[in-house]
Amino acid sequence: MAKLTPFAWIAAVAAGILSLAGHQVSAAAVDGSELPFPPVPSASKAGPTLQTSVHHRRAQPNHLAKDAPNVLIILIDDVGYGQASTYGGEINTPNLTRIAQSGISYNAFHNTSICSPTRAALLTGRNHQRVGSGTIAERAVDWDGYTGVIPKTSATVAEVLKNYGYKTAAFGKWHNTPADQTTAMGPFDKWPNGYGFEYFYGFLAGETSQWEPRLAENTSIIEPPNTPGYHLTEDLADHAIGWLKKHQSYTPDKPFFIYFATGGAHGPHHVAPAWTAKYKGKFDDGYEAMRERIIKRQKESGWVPQATELTRRVESMPAWDSIPASERPFQLRLMETFAGFVEHTDAQVGRVIDELERTGKRDNTIIMYIFGDNGASAEGQRGSISELLAQNNIPNTVDQQITALNKLGGLD
């Protein structure tokens, strides 16, 4: 079996957890260089007969103190931190705010511009190309650094914590397996269960429908629930809460590690109309005026330096004043739908945190709420009613936009 070699941040997390727990361990144990731990030798001795044999049930080693903290990593997809009300934005994120107000906020999270590399680096603590993730999993090729497969010699944080006795689970987006290896036949060692997660519920792709997702549970492809009003992000929160309840019932003495990675707010932007309606009229003066408001608030709050200047509008984004009046309702509805989707996503995160509070576990849980894996959603530009149309550079006609106006965000 290959030795697991976690890199700096994972080793630091493990060391910090052990330190917080008041547990004294050797340097080798802290850095994880000898994981998995060697098996405990048996104290039993078999003699010629039962009477001359000695049986002692071996005690399982405890590598953690009783009060070792739980760990919850929350990763939101395709958002920029400047969009959150927490940091001066226009989208309500009360649950991000309550975590920020009770902890420490960082505004220099260094990531890559696409999903898979950022996630591979986050999970392993290594440069994304060092772990085969130089591009998104769907574009994996057999070149060093671009295979789309995290090598087994590079431990994920889940593997490290699992070896120390943590219960581990992942919910939501898993974008670190090449597309041709996500079928019902595996190979399953490239799925989350093969990277230290004892339980997985989510999807194996960069995106999926929130209404009719392609779901996987552990190593099985499953059908989504046929429930009226079903929404994937709500389902992920339901499963995370259910898992926490099982943990509380069966293994309350063991700490847990949860990786909660939502599909929101990556396209397609799917959310119930009630959430979209909350932003009706909020952006009527256009996105350029919105940017000015956000940067002003961020400077006032100290989130960005006073000398910060807005980036220039990219040429592919038309100036708001240049958009014909007949097209503006469509553009505004796109913005309102996205905003509703983001707030809805934050609300589901809040439900998971509520469960930690209900069971009295929040105070002993390290929560890392990462608001954006690679910056804001790039599905903007002129907007589209169909991703396939956008990918083929086929613009929507005004008639198509008007017809689709009240369908945006919905199943149709």
Predicted regions and their residues:
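Bacterial N-terminal signal peptides that target proteins for export
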Residues: 1-11
